[in-house]
Amino acid sequence: MTNLNEQYEEKVRPCIDLIDSLRSLGVEKDLALPAIAVIGDQSSGKSSVLEALSGVALPRGSGIVTRCPLELKMKRKNDGEGWQGKISYQDHEEEIQDPADVEKKIEEAQIQIAGVGVGISENMISLEIASPDVPDLTLIDLPGITRVAVHGQPVNIGEQIKKLIHKFITKQETICLVVHACNVDLATTEALQMAQEEDPEGERTLGILTKPDLVDKGTEQMVIDILQNEVIHLKKGYMIVRCRGQQEIMQKVSLAEAIEREKAFFADHAHFCSLYDDGQATVPRLAEKLTLELVHHIEKSLPRLEEQIEEKLEQAQAELVRYGTGPPSDAAERLYFLIDKVTAFTQDTISLAAGEELRCGEKLNIFSALRREFDKWSIHLSHTGQKFNARIDKEVAIYEDKYRGRELPGFINYKTFEVMVKEQIKQLEEPAVKKLRDIADAVRKLFLQLAQCSFTGFPNLVKTAKAKIETIKLERESTAESMLRTQFKMEMIVYSQDRTYSNSLSDRKKEESEEEERRKGPKLHKERNCMDNHATLQELMLHLKSYYNIASQRLADQVPMVIRYQMLQESAVQLQRQMMQMMQDKENMEFLLKEDLNIGCKRATLQSRIKRLMKARAYLMEF
């Protein structure tokens, strides 16, 4: 470790301190930070590895001993300096004077967070250790993976633990440190399987083999094959360590002495000595590798971390703008605050009706929806006209028999023409009214959405605006329906300017003639039309189609104009007028400005988030 500290003194500690500082700010609530998460099946030797790295005893025993994520922050001090410890969780922070007290303090913290028993919690405990005997390193210890619930444990304890582990190791910023006992088949290790699920390429997974002294004679080569990456490939590779066994703990073998025993074990081992020579064995070498891996991972993650902080900060600031600053306490200022709120809303309703950008920031556009609806109306008129033309061919002879009077053949019966035109146009009235109701409902929803956005956090203002929007919608819809029905009553007067009608009739005759020529030729057409009364009927059909074309064009414009004028322009103006009149009642001000209790909490949360993100940005800029 001396060589490591000399080589990376200016690099290692600042990198790790930076991430620790960001984590202590609570930035991990907002984005993922580079970390090393330690996972392993129960009895894999995970606690022993952490004890060897930290130099302090951690909770151990049968069953689940790690019941909360434990952030283990180790800081190397100069030789001769004293040991320091600190534990913090929730709102509690406590200095630890004696390394022997660490285990007890962690157990107390777990009881406070996860309760008495064997339940687990996602809330983290932070343990900080400063000593000349520890590496510059931060690890997150996670509960050991269990398969079967024992007495007192929830039936789904295994699923709870896996869910907690996945929450940490799914982040690309997390290095997975998988602890595995040498005397257990690697393929059955659940911790490694979970790491492979989240990191299938093995790019951010490091394997740690423990308990090499328990390997059966003759199977040493299998362990070496794993360490040489020939069994399950991990890009970060494998390390092997020998920590204190249960017997050594009972014999009170110190951690320092255990390190010396470990060194002798590997150096003198017939099969594992090569691993020691290659730097793949012992806790000190593991500490060195982990430190370098973490520093490299931090440096690699910093550019993306800066981007994430800027993104999250921008999002939080934009969200805070939506919630606003809250109403002031001074009565006069409260009135001005209300006026500003209502004015901004009413101006946005006018802007919405005009298709302009809104001050509230919402991307609401009614005209794209209106355009689609009015296009549908135009298509409906066209389709109805096509059906009318097809029906004319079948029914015109019937109408001729029914309504023809004393006229000689060749004279068009105007009454027949009028009856058929009126009947066809009358069929368009209800579809026009339905189109009005559909659009009225769409406009109402957008106005309600605008009110919700403009008066976020003020439920009484929202309710008042909604009530007015509903009332105005009914009034304007009734007026618009009356105008549409009047329009259709006027359409019962068969009328068009002579020039307009003559042009339409001429165009229709030209189209019919061209169509007939394409089908049978002009000579045959003329001969057939002169044979009998068919010529009269053909003439009547031309008149019917010509007039419907004029009337449908008139309705294609008039119906949308009525709807748009009443449901948009007039509704917006009336809403603006009524909202302004509402503010004349000064006694109503306090009722309208009563804020939603949750909004104050959300605003405080956002302000806190912005504060810590700005601090985090400052830390990164200074780094």
Curated annotation (Swiss-Prot):
Gene Ontology process terms (BP): defense response to virus; receptor internalization; synaptic vesicle budding from presynaptic endocytic zone membrane
Region (Disordered): 504-527
GO molecular function annotations of the record: GTP binding; GTPase activity; microtubule binding
Induction: By interferons.
Domain GED: 537-623
Annotated GTP binding sites: 40-47, 141-145, 210-213
A GO cellular component entry from the record: plasma membrane
Keyword vocabulary terms for this entry: Cytoplasm, GTP-binding, Nucleotide-binding
Pfam families found in the cross-reference section: Dynamin_M (PF01031), Dynamin_N (PF00350), GED (PF02212)
Cytoplasm listed as a keyword: yes
Biased composition (Basic and acidic residues): 506-519
Region annotation (G2 motif) ranges: 65-67
Subcellular location: Cytoplasm
Domain Dynamin-type G: 30-303
Region described as G5 motif: 242-245
Region (G1 motif): 40-47
Ranges where the record places region G3 motif: 141-144
Similarity comment text for this entry: Belongs to the TRAFAC class dynamin-like GTPase superfamily. Dynamin/Fzo/YdjA family.
Protein name (Swiss-Prot/TrEMBL): Interferon-induced GTP-binding protein Mx
GN (gene name): mx
